[in-house]
From Swiss-Prot:
It comes from Geobacillus kaustophilus (strain HTA426). One of its GO terms (molecular function) is monooxygenase activity. Pfam families: Pyr_redox_3. Coiled coil: none annotated. This is Uncharacterized oxidoreductase CzcO-like. Its EC number is 1.-.-.-. Keywords: Oxidoreductase. It comes from the Bacteria.
Length: 348
């Protein structure tokens, strides 16, 4: 089956839905394709205790606020249900269970092959986001079968793990939240390859994101000197729990994980430990190998763009970290980038 649209949006999570909102507002013939079974599954399938560090007032898309206390912090299930409700409210044409196999361009027309039919479009917005495939270091293969290992993308709760100690490798906010959760009744090690920075969730009774907004930090753009500086820094850990547990000795910090042999894990300071469980909080990587169009990706496989606009006429990206602003990859920030793209789409 072949679908013909003016604009095809690839990705049906927050970036794709924000783009869909503006396309719908402008009466453009479009479709959104997503590989999930249900809208919001990207969030719904994350670990049970996941809570966003952005307050509800900064965790919604254009045209529809997130329900609940605006100063409270939403759970992952709230966000999943919100995205589903959002798509229904604006009657966005979404085709689920549809995974893109290839994107090509022939004679000014984009041709998209999927597992569920083909699409022809004048313009394409790639809104798959940065969290596509879990990254696990190659030396994980050397870990003994007796040690249970799981990436954060497949971790749900402590009951998955076997009895005994845990090493969490990677100290982003997911790794921090999981380490805190596990420290209640386990010996927990946290392997960190950089100096951790801790930001409180609130200052003087207001969310730190209220202060970020007040100071203009959320709108700092990548082309500014401040933006260049911030973008090169590691992300801070939001909240005080991890810091307190480290100080109390309930979570033991180890430097970068260097190698594994059986059940012995070695670190950058030459220390070694043996644990019964390893959680890889080592992040994700983007896979755009299905984009079969020249001059779209750089030598690292990353999109080449200016504010999401590529040099290939009609091809756009949305939902990238630092796409233009500090908040571009956050739910509350993606709408501004979608609005910028709709103006470019309408003018070309």
């Amino acid at each position: 089956m072949q679908h013909i649209v003016d604009v095809l949006v690839i990705g049906a999570s927050q970036a794709g839905l924000a783009m869909g909102y503006y396309l719908k507002q402008n009466n453009i013939l479009f479709a959104i394709v997503g590989k999930e079974n249900r809208i919001g599954d990207v969030w719904r399938n994350r670990y049970d205790s996941l809570v966003l560090f952005t307050p509800r007032w900064f965790s919604s898309l254009p045209g529809m606020a997130l329900k609940g206390d605006p100063n409270g912090y939403p759970t992952k299930d709230e966000i999943a249900d919100y995205l589903e409700d959002y798509a229904q409210k604006f009657e966005l044409p979404i085709h689920l269970n549809t995974e893109v196999i290839s994107l090509q361009k022939e004679d000014e027309i984009f041709k998209v092959t999927t597992n569920n039919g083909n699409y022809v479009a004048e313009k394409v917005v790639v809104a798959t986001g940065p969290f596509q495939k879990p990254y696990i270091p190659p030396f994980a293969e050397s870990l003994s079968d007796k040690v249970y290992q799981v990436h954060t993308s497949r971790y749900l709760n402590p009951s998955q793990l076997q009895e005994g100690s845990v090493l969490v490798v990677g100290a982003g906010n997911s790794g921090a939240q999981i380490a805190v959760e596990l420290s209640e009744d386990r010996e927990v090690y946290l392997s960190v390859g950089h100096k951790m920075k801790f930001f409180p969730l609130e200052i003087m009774g207001k969310s730190i994101f209220w202060w970020f907004k007040k100071l203009g930090l959320l709108n700092v753009h990548i082309n500014s000197s401040l933006g260049q500086f911030i973008s090169k820094q590691s992300d801070p850990i939001f909240g005080k729990e991890l810091k307190h547990l480290i100080q109390e000795g309930k979570i033991k910090i180890k430097p970068r994980t260097e190698s594994i042999l059986g059940d012995v894990i070695s670190f950058a300071d030459n220390s070694q430990i043996q644990v019964q469980n390893v959680i890889w909080a080592t992040g994700f990587y983007s896979d755009y190998s299905w984009i079969q169009i020249p001059n779209v990706l750089d030598h690292r496989g990353k999109p080449i763009h200016q504010r999401g606009v590529t040099s290939v006429k009609g091809l756009y990206f949305l939902g990238l970290p630092w796409q233009y602003r500090r908040g571009s990859a956050l739910i509350g920030g993606v709408g501004a980038d979608a609005e910028y793209l709709i103006n470019d789409i309408l003018n070309h």
